[in-house]
Amino acid sequence: MVAVLSGFQLRAADPVVAPVNMEPLTIEGNRFVTLCIMIRTTPWEVSRDVKLHPRDEVDWHTLEGVRALREAFATNNPNGRLTWGFTMNALEDGRKNYREIRDYVVECQKKYGDEVTYFPGYFPAMYLPRERVNREMSEAIEIISKMVGNGYRPQSIMGGFLSADNLRYLAEKENIHVAHAVIWSQHNIDGGGADGSPSYPFYPSTEHFCKPAQGKSDFIDCVNLDGWTMD
């Protein structure tokens, strides 16, 4: 389990849960801190059968661990929502820890209004053909929709790095218009990196996922969110 935190101090305590407010937030004039929890079976999972690191993380992923993190977040941010991202393996793993986590996350979606989505493991665009990345994103979205039920559908993808073609596919084929698709500060470390990009949200160009669109002719209607943004 990997949690991406910015600006929060989490304390274990009984959560104080207010009624979930599902009204859309106004972007203009506001600032936001996002918290995402990634559920995976190994580091740097690119696909079911493409894993860049062999370590099995099942013992790191427990119901007790994710519950403590979610409840600490609720205690300190009673109206806050967060995003859960599952790798394909984490969506399908039949072991007890992952089954319990999936069931709990479905409860959190109903209780808090959390986003539940696909996390294709940081580096899919570097190790898989773009068509396969697109196909597996659609497959994962369908799995998640069935898992959560009640017509639920993810509104974002937690990508790590996704190509411009992948972002265009999300916008045009899946009607998803937000993706974490770049880590601007990461270059030539871990299992891959990028060439740099703006460190704040932007609409990408069809030419490259790190390039902001220059006009209508190269505009992709999927906001590219940097994963490691810092002021």
What are these regions (language model features)?
Residues 1-7:
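Bacterial N-terminal signal peptides
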Residues 15-106:
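Active-site beta->alpha N-cap acidic-glycine motif
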Residues 20-21, 156-231:
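Active-site-adjacent pocket scaffolds in enzyme catalytic domains
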Residues 38, 121, 182-184:
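Histidine-centered beta-alpha loop that forms part of the nucleotide-sugar donor binding/catalytic region
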Residues 43-45, 91-94, 124-128, 163-168, ...:
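Short catalytic/ligand-binding loop motif for oxyanion handling, primarily in non-cytosolic enzymes
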Residues 64-68, 135, 139, 143, ...:
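Extracytoplasmic/secreted proteins, especially bacterial periplasmic and envelope-associated proteins
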Residues 79-162, 224, 229-231:
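Metal-dependent polysaccharide deacetylase catalytic core of the NodB/CE4 family, i.e.
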